[in-house]
Amino acid sequence: MTETPEIQPVRIRDYVCGPGEPLLVIAGPCVLQSRELALQIGEELARINQRSDVQVIFKASFDKANRTSLAAQRGPGIEQGLGLLEAVRANTGLPVTTDIHLPEQAAAVGEVCDLLQIPAFLARQTDLLVAAASTGRPVNVKKGQFMSPGDMRYVVDKLRGSGDGGVMACERGTFFGYGRLVNDMQAIPIMRSLGVPVVFDATHSVQQPGGLGGATGGNREMVEPLARAAVAIGCDALFFETHPDPQTSPSDGPNMIPLDRFAGTLDRLLRLREAVDGLDG
């Protein structure tokens, strides 16, 4: 029988993600819109980060390169977007992360961001993975909606073979026919058995691809139930998108948590994690 490797904790600035560490929470708006909005959300996340049982990273995209429609808004672009992320980092003290879509974006993003993210649709793109890992930054790679959790071993191998910044794998749902995603919670322990901390993306898991015609729909009321299941089964980190007024977000509004509900949602999840940790004590 092949021995299961120990999970290798991932260091993100002063944070550590892995077994026995405070819950890592990656959160923010889906896409960067303005400096004012980014700082508003970042300041609320920094307030939450004062808790001792959580480690918060600010996340937002500078380009939504896989939008459903050509007419959909994509974001401010890499130059302006990285400037906004730098402002959030400087004003809140939070680590920041964003996703990259092309290998040539990796170096510039690695200069600003503390963690690089690989979108699920691009999880098997070798050149992108190699470029991300080569920055020396830790990488959070989302499991493709079309992939089995066991097949993520090859993705992890590509990243580990190209850099030593650390790897996290993220569960964000699996295609279930057309326009629907489901979560197989077995994915969390299976991917942890690859020796990496596992993130659960609670808001993208409730997406309904193409559910609004030229845009993606979603069901935010299912975000917390799924996040509770992920915490109960032992995820190392949670991922959420949040916005003061989700209906005005250019992307993913239907599955985002309203900012004024985020702290309460997280508090309940942290109390659940404390109870789960007690079972292992």
UniProtKB/Swiss-Prot annotation:
GO molecular function: 3-deoxy-8-phosphooctulonate synthase activity
Cross-referenced InterPro entries: Aldolase_TIM, DAHP1/KDSA, KDO8P_synthase
UniProt entry tagged with the keyword Transferase: yes
Documented EC number(s): 2.5.1.55
Gene Ontology process terms (BP): keto-3-deoxy-D-manno-octulosonic acid biosynthetic process; monosaccharide biosynthetic process
Main location: cytoplasm
Pfam family membership, one: DAHP_synth_1
EC class (word): transferase
Entry keywords, A to Z: Cytoplasm, Lipopolysaccharide biosynthesis, Transferase
GO CC annotation, single: cytosol
Record-linked HAMAP family: KDO8P_synth (MF_00056)
Similarity comment: family membership: Belongs to the KdsA family.
Protein's UniProt name: 2-dehydro-3-deoxyphosphooctonate aldolase
